[in-house]
């Protein structure tokens, strides 16, 4: 039974799609000058696959990958297990009840007929089963019943062999019959496959004409191609169901005396080549069938198999097309996603680099402005403090300068040398008192060089209040240099945050508005207090 499915799907001679479609499947009137639309038919060149894949494919089929085969195998196994569980749940209770019923019937028969032993009863039942397996009904008078091997019945049995249906209600019992059945099936099944192919081609022609008319009508109404294909498929299946399923089911219900469910069950099981054999047309020994009844049933099986083969082939083609289109769409989506990711990554890197450069430049400018403002404010404060000293006190500071020196390039303003010396009280003029405040402050601002060049003897002879003022200026200069170094390090680091930029800008704004930092104000107040005490 499974061989029929293999033939329908994998062997070209056995599939109902063998030859070129007749030209009537694509009439010129149906095209209206446009490209022909994919049509549902049984012919191989009129199938959906041939039209949707295009002539570039050349009819070549790709080999299925092992991963796909394993995945399908797993799905089939799961499907089989599910079906087995459902059938067991539905049929096992009935089987158990039948076992109990036959056991009770046998016990009751032996109780009513004491003269019959259990062994004799079992022998009688076994003979009845053998007769039934041989095709002889043990019910009623078997001598008056029709033979299972008359010409009509034998013809019907031969048809079930080459169609691979195999109902199983009758089977050859002799060795000669079994050997002939093997040879008959080997040569008959391929021959029947060719016949199915020819009938399928003719059915494709008939349905192709009908579907072309339907497509022409819908194309005039400007219906989309997808809707046309869906409607054509539905009409194709409905027409086949009416001709090959509904009408035969009604006939079998009337002749065989079956219910509607049993009739439809027999039709579907037969046309799918399953053939359980529990229901067989012409197999009721109590009905006198006409001689032409069984040959007519076999002819219906022939045409119905061709139709069902076309339906199954069409479903398989649609699945292949959908699978291929899905793979192509997934590939396109992956390509677009990769391209989009690359573009976004490049844009992100460029934006990050640009922002990093801008932030770094702003931080550098802010740090430079802050350093210059601090230096300017510190110089102003020192100059103001020195101006408050008397000429005698300033002469003492002038004595500390034993040699000429200048500020470092880092601390000097505009890299100018500081060559100005403080003069004594007798040499101090009005011009000397107010001249070059910047050079004076730069000398005292360079604490490192001042420490190296200062005269230790003069330092020891300085008064205590002057030493306090000197230490205050020195500590203040050291603190200022440390703050400037820390600010430059923070501004030059790669991981500087925008918070530092905000702080620098705020401090710059405060300095531009004339606000003096708190530490500078405190230091100035302390210097003023020391000077007042000294005076």
UniProtKB/Swiss-Prot annotation:
<protein>
    <recommendedName>
        <fullName>Potassium channel subfamily K member 10</fullName>
    </recommendedName>
</protein>
<feature type="binding site">
    <location>
        <position position="166"/>
    </location>
    <ligand>
        <name>K(+) 2</name>
    </ligand>
</feature>
<feature type="topological domain" description="Cytoplasmic">
    <location>
        <begin position="200"/>
        <end position="230"/>
    </location>
</feature>
<feature type="transmembrane region" description="Helical">
    <location>
        <begin position="231"/>
        <end position="251"/>
    </location>
</feature>
<keyword id="KW-1003">Cell membrane</keyword>
<keyword id="KW-1015">Disulfide bond</keyword>
<feature type="binding site">
    <location>
        <position position="167"/>
    </location>
    <ligand>
        <name>K(+) 3</name>
    </ligand>
</feature>
<feature type="binding site">
    <location>
        <position position="276"/>
    </location>
    <ligand>
        <name>K(+) 3</name>
    </ligand>
</feature>
<feature type="binding site">
    <location>
        <position position="165"/>
    </location>
    <ligand>
        <name>K(+) 2</name>
    </ligand>
</feature>
<keyword id="KW-1133">Transmembrane helix</keyword>
<feature type="intramembrane region" description="Pore-forming; Name=Pore-forming 2">
    <location>
        <begin position="260"/>
        <end position="291"/>
    </location>
</feature>
<dbReference type="InterPro" id="IPR013099">
    <property type="entry name" value="K_chnl_dom"/>
</dbReference>
<keyword id="KW-0472">Membrane</keyword>
<feature type="site" description="pH sensor">
    <location>
        <position position="148"/>
    </location>
</feature>
<dbReference type="GO" id="GO:1904551">
    <property type="term" value="P:cellular response to arachidonate"/>
</dbReference>
<feature type="region of interest" description="Disordered">
    <location>
        <begin position="510"/>
        <end position="535"/>
    </location>
</feature>
<dbReference type="GO" id="GO:0005886">
    <property type="term" value="C:plasma membrane"/>
</dbReference>
<dbReference type="InterPro" id="IPR003976">
    <property type="entry name" value="2pore_dom_K_chnl_TREK"/>
</dbReference>
<feature type="transmembrane region" description="Helical">
    <location>
        <begin position="296"/>
        <end position="316"/>
    </location>
</feature>
<feature type="binding site">
    <location>
        <position position="275"/>
    </location>
    <ligand>
        <name>K(+) 2</name>
    </ligand>
</feature>
<dbReference type="GO" id="GO:0098782">
    <property type="term" value="F:mechanosensitive potassium channel activity"/>
</dbReference>
<feature type="binding site">
    <location>
        <position position="274"/>
    </location>
    <ligand>
        <name>K(+) 2</name>
    </ligand>
</feature>
<feature type="region of interest" description="Selectivity filter 1">
    <location>
        <begin position="164"/>
        <end position="169"/>
    </location>
</feature>
<feature type="binding site">
    <location>
        <position position="165"/>
    </location>
    <ligand>
        <name>K(+) 1</name>
    </ligand>
</feature>
<feature type="binding site">
    <location>
        <position position="273"/>
    </location>
    <ligand>
        <name>K(+) 1</name>
    </ligand>
</feature>
<feature type="topological domain" description="Cytoplasmic">
    <location>
        <begin position="1"/>
        <end position="68"/>
    </location>
</feature>
<feature type="transmembrane region" description="Helical">
    <location>
        <begin position="69"/>
        <end position="89"/>
    </location>
</feature>
<feature type="binding site">
    <location>
        <position position="274"/>
    </location>
    <ligand>
        <name>K(+) 1</name>
    </ligand>
</feature>
<feature type="binding site">
    <location>
        <position position="164"/>
    </location>
    <ligand>
        <name>K(+) 4</name>
    </ligand>
</feature>
<dbReference type="GO" id="GO:0015271">
    <property type="term" value="F:outward rectifier potassium channel activity"/>
</dbReference>
<comment type="subunit">
    <text>Homodimer; disulfide-linked. Forms heterodimers with other 2-pore domain K(+) channel subunits, such as KCNK2, KCNK4 and KCNK18.</text>
</comment>
<dbReference type="InterPro" id="IPR003280">
    <property type="entry name" value="2pore_dom_K_chnl"/>
</dbReference>
<feature type="transmembrane region" description="Helical">
    <location>
        <begin position="179"/>
        <end position="199"/>
    </location>
</feature>
<feature type="region of interest" description="Selectivity filter 2">
    <location>
        <begin position="273"/>
        <end position="278"/>
    </location>
</feature>
<keyword id="KW-0479">Metal-binding</keyword>
<dbReference type="GO" id="GO:0046872">
    <property type="term" value="F:metal ion binding"/>
</dbReference>
<feature type="binding site">
    <location>
        <position position="275"/>
    </location>
    <ligand>
        <name>K(+) 3</name>
    </ligand>
</feature>
<feature type="intramembrane region" description="Pore-forming; Name=Pore-forming 1">
    <location>
        <begin position="151"/>
        <end position="177"/>
    </location>
</feature>
<keyword id="KW-0406">Ion transport</keyword>
<feature type="binding site">
    <location>
        <position position="273"/>
    </location>
    <ligand>
        <name>K(+) 4</name>
    </ligand>
</feature>
<keyword id="KW-0630">Potassium</keyword>
<feature type="topological domain" description="Cytoplasmic">
    <location>
        <begin position="317"/>
        <end position="535"/>
    </location>
</feature>
């Amino acid at each position: 039974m499974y061989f029929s499915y293999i033939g329908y799907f994998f062997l070209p001679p056995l599939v109902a799609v063998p030859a070129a479609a007749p030209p009537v499947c694509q009439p010129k009137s149906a095209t209206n000058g446009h490209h022909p639309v994919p049509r549902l038919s049984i012919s191989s060149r009129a199938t959906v696959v041939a039209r949707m894949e295009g002539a570039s494919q050349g009819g070549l089929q790709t080999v299925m990958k092992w991963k796909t085969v394993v995945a399908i195998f797993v799905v089939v196994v799961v499907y089989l297990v599910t079906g087995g569980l459902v059938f067991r749940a539905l049929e096992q209770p009935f089987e158990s009840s039948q076992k109990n019923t036959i056991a009770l019937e046998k016990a009751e028969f032996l109780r009513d007929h004491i003269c019959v032993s259990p062994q004799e009863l079992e022998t009688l039942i076994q003979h009845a089963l053998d007769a039934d397996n041989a095709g002889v009904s043990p019910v009623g008078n078997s001598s008056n019943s029709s033979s299972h091997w008359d010409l009509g019945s034998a013809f019907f049995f031969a048809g079930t062999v080459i169609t691979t249906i195999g109902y199983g209600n009758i089977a050859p019992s002799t060795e000669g019959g079994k050997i002939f059945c093997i040879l008959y099936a080997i040569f008959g099944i391929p021959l029947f496959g060719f016949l199915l192919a020819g009938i399928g081609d003719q059915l494709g022609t008939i349905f192709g004409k009908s579907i072309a008319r339907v497509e022409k009508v819908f194309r005039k109404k400007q219906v989309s191609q997808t809707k046309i294909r869906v409607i054509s498929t539905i009409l194709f299946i409905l027409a086949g169901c009416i001709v090959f399923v509904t009408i035969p089911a009604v006939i079998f219900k009337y002749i065989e005396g079956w219910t509607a469910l049993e009739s439809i069950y027999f039709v579907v099981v037969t046309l799918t080549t399953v053939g359980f054999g529990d229901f067989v047309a012409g197999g009721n020994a109590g009905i006198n069938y006409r001689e032409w009844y069984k040959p007519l049933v076999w002819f219906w099986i022939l045409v119905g198999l061709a139709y069902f083969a076309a339906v199954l082939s069409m479903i398989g083609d649609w699945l292949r097309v959908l699978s291929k289109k899905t793979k192509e769409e997934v590939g396109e989506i992956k390509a677009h996603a990769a391209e989009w990711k690359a573009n976004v990554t490049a844009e992100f890197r460029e934006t990050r680099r640009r922002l990093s450069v801008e932030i770094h430049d702003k931080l550098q400018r802010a740090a430079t402005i802050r350093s210059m403002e601090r230096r300017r404010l510190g110089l102003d404060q020192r100059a103001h403090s020195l101006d408050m000293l008397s000429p005698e006190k300033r002469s003492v500071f002038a004595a500390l300068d034993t040699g000429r020196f200048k500020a470092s390039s880092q601390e000097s303003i505009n890299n100018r040398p500081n060559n100005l010396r403080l003069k004594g009280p007798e040499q101090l003029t009005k011009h000397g008192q107010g001249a070059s405040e910047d050079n004076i402050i730069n000398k005292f601002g360079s604490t490192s060089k001042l420490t190296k060049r200062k005269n230790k003897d003069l330092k020891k002879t300085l008064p205590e209040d002057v030493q306090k003022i000197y230490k205050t200026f020195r500590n203040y200069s050291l603190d200022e240099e440390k703050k400037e170094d820390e600010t430059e390090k923070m501004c030059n680091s790669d991981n500087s945050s925008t918070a530092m930029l905000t702080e620098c800008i705020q401090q710059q704004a405060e300095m531009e508005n004339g606000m003096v930092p708190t530490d500078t104000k405190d230091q100035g107040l302390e210097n003023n207090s020391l000077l007042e005490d000294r005076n």
